C-alpha cells in the first residue's frame, strides 16, 4: 500500500455523545448534534511527525503532540493495515467541551481512526474501526454512537464478539445538556469501572 500523496486532505465531522443512559452502564449511549470537526492533511516528514492544531469555540488555539488521542488512534490504523506511519497534520475545530461528559475523547478517537483510514483509501472495514475504537477507549458506550450515530446498545456475545443494537429514538424525546463548571476527565473517573459491577 502506497503512502498518500502530499497535500491530500480528509475532513471528518464527529458528534458528541451522552452515555451510561438509564441501566446501560458502559453499554448504552447516544449521539448528539454537537460536533467536532477534523481536517487531516498529509504533510512532509516521517511517521513521528504529527501536527495537531486545535481551535476551541472561544477562539483559543491549542497544540497537541504524539501523545494525543487523535494520533494514537491513527497509529492503530497504521499498525492494523501494516502501513508505515507518515506525517499528518490535524486541524480541529472544537465545539464539544472537553472533560464535561459529552464524549470529547470519543470524538478524538473516532476522528483519528476514520481520518487515517480514509486518507489511505480505507483499507480497514467499519467493523475493524469499531473494534479499534472500543479497544482504545476501554468501553463502547461513547465511541460506538460517535462512529455510527443514533442510540446504540453494545455488548459482547457469547463468542466475545461485539454486538451492536441500533435503538429507535422517539421523536418526543429531546436531549437537554447541563454542562458543569468543573472539568473531569475520563481517566479521573475510571475507578468506577473497578467498583461497579460489569453489566455488559
Residue ranges and their predicted role:
Residues 193-200:
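Single conserved hydrophobic/aromatic residue that forms the stacking wall/gate
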Residues 1-100, 114, 118, 122:
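ATP-binding N-lobe of GHMP and related small-molecule kinases
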Residues 34, 179-184:
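Glycine-rich beta-alpha junction loops
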Residues 34, 102-124, 146-152, 157:
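DPxDG-like acidic metal-binding loop motif
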Residues 188-190:
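Acidic, proline/serine/threonine- and glycine-rich low-complexity intrinsically disordered segments
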Residues 124-174:
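Alpha/beta catalytic cores of group-transfer enzymes, especially the acyltransferase/condensing modules
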Residues 11, 37, 151-153, 175-177:
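Conserved hydrophobic/aromatic beta-strand scaffold that supports enzyme active sites
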